């Protein structure tokens, strides 16, 4: 394993680009070769190792996009997941999210960005959003076009607010795409 870890540190990025650039054509071959840093373990793990460490109640392969595992840990959305015993994969390369979009799933488990607004959502959230409707509307009006919506969430533990993404393109993917030539600002 030590030899493969060294190999992956040198050529892992090319494996991920191979997965993405081939539009997932070689995903059956490449999916077991790519690795990501585990926030919990602080080392590279394969997708198989990550899924094998799942608890019975875990439905998703959770990931956060940041340059380091510590940066993923610092995201408000990660605190509750880690406290509940879930691991989070650190996607530190620009291509990581694009590559897993080509995979779609791994062993019937979907990939889920921890910044996705649905992570940690509960039926209790809907009730609280209805109860606090006037306050949330006032906050949205005060913030204007800076946010698309304001809502209550039980997904956070010790942080009062967070940014989340909605839809297929995450905040990090938007940054990568906006940095490309001919990107509209």
What are these model-predicted stretches?
Residues 1-185:
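Conserved GHKL (Bergerat-fold) ATPase module
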